[in-house]
């Protein structure tokens, strides 16, 4: 920036994870974890005239991205997560308030103070320090977000696979389908079969080449030659398909290109 004679606006990504005895509740996102870290960084900013601090990001992943009412988890696990969330929120709010005070004392005027994610919109909205809310996956309301106690989103996206084989009377095999969500591995990262109301096979799951499922009900195959799924998280559809079909009352009302369709690969 200095070589180009420009001033580059920058934002700080500040860690708002909470460490409990024996449990690190959050993500390893930033080295700015406490007041001393932030003050040390602010102290060197005057030596960087080509940089202008304009924003702060404080993503509370442990609230926004961790399910607490998931059917695939036992009751004790869900109860523990809800307890940790409740105990995390006061720490997060206090730390954000301290961040605000430190920045004000340093004469920094922010354009935005960012926080939030799909699973934490309500709690972040109530945080006075935050001026900008972020949510991404919530636009699609994918399957992982069925597992939250505080909100129930309405599914807004999914995908269809062609059923190409019937290797057993109650087993149907789709072409492709291995569209897995990111993050820690587990069955909750698999696509969720919506139609017909069957279940994936434990030994195969959703595969790059094929996705078999078991269904003992009535299916007029090969006339009924498709299965409908919901993806688990957010990026799977835009990574795998060139465009999304926009449906309105059962009819195709338009088409929207994904970043794959635009020839983009960001990460």
Describe the role of every protein-language-model region.
Residues 1-6:
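Active-site-adjacent beta->alpha loops and helix N-cap segments on the catalytic face
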Residues 7, 16-141:
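Active-site loop/helix belt of alpha/beta enzymes
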Residues 104-105, 109-113, 160, 168, ...:
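Substrate-binding and catalytic surfaces of secreted/luminal carbohydrate-active proteins
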Residues 118-122, 139-141, 147, 170-171, ...:
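Short, catalytically relevant binding-site loops at active-site mouths
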Residues 153-160:
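Short coil-to-beta-strand transition motifs
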Residues 166-267:
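C-terminal accessory subdomain/extension
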